Amino acid sequence: MIAPAVPNVPWQERPEGLKGAPIWRYTENPISGRNPVEGVARIFNSAVMPYNGEFIGVFRGEQTNGIPYIYLGHSKDAIHWDFEKDKIPFVDENGNSFMPYYAYDPRLVKVEDTYYIIWCQDFYGASIGMAKTKDFKTFVRLENPFIPFNRNAVLFPRKINGKFMLLSRPSDSGHTPFGDIFLSESPDMVYWGKHRHVMGRSSEWWESVKIGGGAAPIETSEGWLLFYHGVSGTCNGFVYSIGGAILDLDNPSIVKYRCETFLLTPEEWYEERGFVPNVVFPCATIHDPESGKIAIYYGCADSYVGLAFTKFDEIVDYIKTHSVVRQEDTEIGIR
């Protein structure tokens, strides 16, 4: 992994007898509870990262009026979190309040000296919203990158060939029954273009309905390690699982490896039961290149935040060993 060292990455050793993919859950999951602050019923689908020797995060808080918004959280160990009671106060470039009607499923990525928050919001339908901060005190809204409808935007943690790179999932305004991952680039985080298809839903049952970006890609010598979500349909609704892929380092619209099996699927009570049952939804990782430890943060049943662990060498080997890449995934994504 090519990233700054994080020696205090949260960690729990692999349990004996683990079967399937080399990912295991934190035994004290979930790490968020109901009614975490006044006026918020649930916190889930949230993104965290190291900050000033400790940890900071942006959290989807479902308010008691049913409207989701983004709240800031602080932690010394990235497991036990204190949430600010007020939602994040976004402003425009002139310092005037500029608040979306709702905001949910945030991601948090640092590029150079700036932290970027990306979320889904209402802009005449489901759309992508963006903001930037350098101190987690002033949050400046950026222009919406795309017209409706789009979700699951994930920013790469560094520029590639001098450009910002963003994954997204074009969709509809509801519970989208389709969806592929696309790549877009920008010179300035305002104007986006050169859209490329990255990968689509597959014939594998667990991701046969739609897929979407998850945690920010992790730079490695093998390529960009991507944890994403895949969705299947059942007689009881959608099931969300976590998948893994490795994208080309210089041209991430090209998929080098894509695991044919899920890495994590709903099994525990906090994943199977909740506001939206049967959901594991990856949003962030904290990773330490020196030890190879990766902590994965994921939403559980639209009700909780869960934590899982893996080792870099083991998960990359598993993805490569179980890889099935379609011809269109290996193309540059333009027709």
Task: Give residue spans per PLM region.
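C-terminal substrate/ligand-recognition segments
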Residues: 283, 287
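Beta-rich carbohydrate-recognition and catalytic domains
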Residues: 1-101, 109-154, 158-209, 218-275, ...
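Iron-sulfur (Fe-S) cluster-binding modules
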Residues: 280
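Catalytic core of Fe(II)/2-oxoglutarate
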Residues: 215
